Swiss-Prot record:
It is found in: Cell membrane. It comes from Nicotiana plumbaginifolia. Expressed in roots, stems, leaves from both vegetative and flowering plants, and flowers at early and late stages of development with highest expression levels found in flowers and root tissue. Belongs to the cation transport ATPase (P-type) (TC 3.A.3) family. Type IIIA subfamily. This is Plasma membrane ATPase 3.
Length: 956
């Protein structure tokens, strides 16, 4: 039976509070039963409520295509096309249709390529995102089915079990209580218990239990969707668009200046005819505008986007690639990104209190007091320490298991051994277990001392106790409890995190840890990862009451130099990004929950990590499909390679604009040489076709964050373009005003004659301009000698094919409509030789420009000692000092000053040198943990043992 929209109107308009009314009224309002919906009813409700996902604005393909033809560069070309046919030719000649058709063809080709590449990249990203779409187990037509979570509707009955991400807002039905992790929504770090009748939110995670639920809200109507809706999808203009506009404006202004000079000289001074003057202006317009620039850059980014997707980073916003190349600060979540998000026990640090018990026995006892199925994180960590999880119940018979509850804060197992004797083991919060112990007063001080030592290292403590139950009944209180041991729990770093952070530092990316955990845990993770321990509680920096010890220093400076932040709330993430951006850093931010969305949106590069919620993915620029930090660093390298290609092209484009404008302007003004506009179109078409291949060029990624340096681009473009223009002017003078080439090479003369029509000279100038202009790309793509850096094969092949075509046109073409005449192979050879000879100084000019722009940069690099140093071997000297210090400390050659480790440093008196010394001493502990001897000494120091006595008895 079909649903009438008005029946569910109250639900759609949210005038009924489905979250708080009795569960029977929920079913009544939703017009559903515990047997679920039929497929037909679900489909009808889907048309009423919409899909269970966040809305995304989609642009029509046609308007997107037109967008590529609607920008300042295209406007200039469109104006040139109109000039070609609208302005009179004079003498009864028809309009220049060939120029008009050529310009329009060039525009359409560029727009089509841009559209196809960007559309393909978008489709690829959409397909990958679709693969990440969550699934849900739903009751339809009386059968349980696995469906995409997007098709859920209010009234559906769903099944929720351990590990599931709740697909929609729902009310729980009959069953055991669930443990729900709502941290992605509310920031609560601990799971909350939800029982029958309680509401659960879309985006939260089930950590324990299994139950059925009725869906009460989907899509934008969920708590999740409303929170995400608050994050404005602002279409702010990115760095890339600003740079593109700046380069385009520079080229347009250069052309405008050239045209104004031509108009002033040609008409009032030279008294040139109307139409030849217009043709000269068209040459500057057509040849000077880098019409292919948006296309080349779009194609380069689209191909780069495919490459990033293969590496596990889906690019939602293309221009994020350019911003990632310049990223110099990455704020990374600790849990799940830097660490495994999986608790483990360090067996070698277990502190045993009972006689005759070793660490393996302690682990076995703790495992017996753990669930073997439907485990929480601590149970999984303990049982995971066993060689085989079955050992937890091997040789015993379980009588009763006491699950964890907030009151007792412990678990316990009552069991019978092989001889039929009853025993009980318990694990839990140390205070609760200590309270059970019969000898509490004797061991209390030692227990607290060990807990404090663990806490200093950022380790959580778990206590284990044991008792015999002589009565043999599970209800019996049993004999005296014996306090067995304290186990240290820690979320270990990923195996590749330390190496990845080292690579990031070498690449000039400063990784800052963001964690909701306490400061000690953050510092211990920092030590193990080698990323520094200069960390602060975020509330001390950004809260209402600032820590007195750091109140004298600017918060922005502390945030900039910090290695991480502990106790972070979602609003702190946003503030951290905002302050880093205020200090001119390009900032990346990782996140996974709805509460991270504002910070992800604010960051220059928002990165949604693996398993992030839809809201985080929606707010982000890049979505990761693999866990860990290494995929981000790989994406940084790939982005820098992509950026290098784009930067190489923009320098080339500016150079060509200057060479065309200056070169042809001088020829027109000095010798009244009218170059055919159609031949400039041919140069543009061949050059643009070749230059497309730069998107797959072989490049070396920059070793440091790379950004658009407009001064460098414009200066290089003006110098190289000016040099090429003078090459053309000198060639024209030698060919037109002297007999140098006929005398030396025996070619026919192109000197001025009484009946000069410039046709052969136009062919010669065409070939000279075409070959050397396109060869310039090999100079702009190189950081050293261009012939020493091997370009991509595709670029080389495209260059030779294009220039073979250009040479054949110059040699054989007799095109009256284009006013050119073939010059033969002799002149073609002379022009190629001329260009090769004058090509070599281009590299020298590029070196001189870099040197001139560098100023005293190297002196600054050597003296700079902050975390954002531009040194290639970032931190090498500091790492060597850390290692030397660690070795001296390890072998007793030097006793470190305990003040170095003081947490209450007076920052007013702290100078830079002392701060560095403090950091070196703290990080040195990491080195101890990475050697066998160092690890032993670490344990010895932690436990306060006598190392000399041990060394006398054992060889370490």
């Amino acid at each position: 039976m079909g649903e009438k929209p008005e029946v569910l109107d109250a639900v759609l308009k949210e005038t009924v509070d489905l979250e708080n009314i009795p569960i029977e009224e929920v079913f009544e309002n939703l017009r559903c039963t515990k047997e679920g919906l039929t497929a037909t009813a679900a489909q009808e409700r889907l048309s009423i409520f919409g899909y269970n996902k966040l809305e995304e604005k989609k642009e029509s393909k046609f308007s997107k295509f037109l967008g590529f033809m609607w920008n300042p560069l295209s406007w200039v070309m469109e104006a040139a096309a109109i000039m070609a046919i609208a302005l009179a030719n004079g003498g009864g000649k028809p309009p220049d249709w060939q120029d008009f058709v050529g310009i329009i063809t060039l525009l359409i080709i560029n727009s089509t390529i841009s559209f196809i590449e960007e559309n393909n990249a978008g489709n690829a990203a959409a397909a990958l995102m679709a693969r990440l779409a969550p699934k849900a187990k739903v009751l339809r037509d009386g059968k349980w089915k696995e469906e995409d979570a997007a098709v859920l509707v209010p009234g559906d009955i769903i099944s929720i079990k351990l590990g599931d991400i709740i697909p929609a807002d729902a009310r729980l039905l009959e069953g055991d209580p669930l443990k729900i992790d709502q941290s992605a929504l509310t920031g609560e770090s601990l799971p909350v218990t939800k029982g029958p009748g309680d509401g659960v939110y879309s985006g939260s995670t089930c950590k324990q239990g299994e139950i059925e639920a009725v869906v009460i809200a989907t899509g934008v109507h969920t708590f999740f969707g409303k929170a995400a809706h608050l994050v404005d999808s602002t279409n702010q203009v990115g760095h890339f668009q600003k740079v593109l506009t700046a380069i385009g404006n520079f080229c347009i202004c250069s052309i405008a200046v050239g045209m104004i000079i031509e108009i002033i000289v040609m008409y009032p001074i030279q008294h040139r005819k109307y139409r030849p003057g217009i043709d000269n202006l068209l040459v500057l317009l057509i040849g000077g505008i880098p019409i292919a620039m948006p296309t080349v850059l779009s194609v380069t980014m689209a191909i780069g986007s495919h490459r990033l997707a293969q590496q596990g980073a889906i690019t939602k916003r293309m221009t994020a690639i350019e911003e990632m190349a310049g990223m110099d600060v990455l704020c990374s979540d600790k849990t799940g990104t830097l660490t495994l998000n999986k608790l483990t026990v360090d067996k070698y640090l277990i502190e045993v209190f009972a006689r005759g018990v070793d660490a393996d026995t302690v682990v076995l006892m703790a495992a017996r007091a753990s669930r073997t199925e439907n485990q929480d994180a601590i149970d999984a960590a303990i049982v995971g320490m066993l060689a085989d999880p079955k050992e937890a119940r091997a040789g015993i018979r379980e009588i009763h298991f006491l699950p964890f509850n907030p009151t007792d804060k412990r678990t316990a197992l009552t069991y019978l051994d092989g001889e039929g004797k009853m025993h009980r083991v318990s694990k839990g919060a140390p205070e609760q277990i200590l309270h059970l112990a019969h000898n509490k007063s004797d061991i209390e001080r030692r227990v607290h001392a060990v807990i404090d030592k663990f806490a200093e290292r950022g380790l959580r403590s778990l206590a284990v106790a044991y008792q015999e139950v002589p009565e043999g009944r599970k209800e019996s209180a049993g004999g005296p409890w014996q306090f067995i041991a304290l186990l240290p729990l820690f979320d270990p770093p990923r195996h590749d995190s330390a190496e990845t952070i080292r690579r990031a530092l070498n690449l000039g990316v400063n990784v800052k840890m963001i964690t909701g955990d306490q400061l000690a845990i953050g510092k211990e993770t920092g030590r193990r990862l080698g990323m520094g321990t200069n960390m602060y509680p975020s509330s001390a920096l950004l809260g209402q009451t600032k820590d007195e010890s750091i109140s004298a220093l600017p918060v922005d400076e502390l945030i900039e130099k910090a290695d991480g932040f502990a106790g972070v709330f979602p609003e702190h993430k946003y503030e951290i990004v905002k302050r880093l951006q205020a200090r001119k850093h390009i900032c990346g931010m990782t996140g996974d929950g709805v509460n991270d969305a504002p910070a992800l949106k604010k960051a220059d590069i928002g990165i949604a990590v693996d398993d992030a919620t839809d809201a985080a993915r929606s707010a982000s620029d890049i979505v990761l499909t693999e866990p860990g930090l290494s995929v981000i660093i790989s994406a940084v390298l790939t982005s820098r390679a992509i950026f290098q290609r784009m930067k190489n092209y923009t320098i080339y484009a500016v150079s060509i604009t200057i060479r065309i404008v200056l070169g042809f302007m001088l020829l027109a003004l000095i010798w009244q040489f009218d170059f055919p506009p159609f031949m400039v179109l041919i140069i543009a078409i061949l050059n643009d076709g070749t230059i497309m291949t730069i998107s797959k060029d072989r490049v070396k990624p920059s070793p440091l964050p790379d950004s658009w340096k407009l001064a460098e681009i414009f200066t290089t473009g003006v110098v190289l373009g000016g040099y090429l223009a003078m090459m053309t002017v000198i060639f024209f003078w030698a060919a037109y005003k002297t007999n140098f080439f006929p005398r030396v090479f025996g070619v026919s003369t192109l000197e001025k004659t009484a009946t000069d029509d410039f046709r052969k000279l136009a062919s010669a100038i065409y070939l000279q301009v075409s070959t050397i202009s396109q060869a310039l790309i090999f100079v702009t793509r190189s950081r050293s000698w261009s012939f020493m850096e091997r370009p991509g094969l595709l670029l080389v092949v495209a260059f030779f094919i294009a220039q073979l075509v250009a040479t054949l046109i110059a040699v054989y073409a007799n095109w009256s409509f284009a006013a050119i005449e073939g010059i033969g192979w002799g002149w073609a050879g002379v022009i190629w030789l001329y260009n090769i000879v004058f090509y070599i100084p281009l590299d020298l000019x590029x070196f001189l420009i870099r040197y001139a722009l560098s100023g005293k940069a190297w002196d600054l690099v050597i003296e700079q000692r902050i975390a954002f140093t531009r040194k290639k071997d970032f931190g090498k000297e500091q790492r060597e000092l850390q290692w030397a210090h660690a070795q001296r400390t390890l072998h007793g050659l030097q006793v470190p000053d305990p003040k170095i480790f003081s947490e209450t440093t007076n920052f007013n008196e702290l100078n830079q040198l002392a701060e560095e010394a403090k950091r070196r001493a703290e990080i040195a502990r990491l080195r101890e943990l990475h050697t066998l001897k160092g690890h032993v000494e670490s344990v010895v120091k932690l436990k306060g043992l006598d190392i000399e006595t041990i060394q006398q008895a054992y060889t370490v």
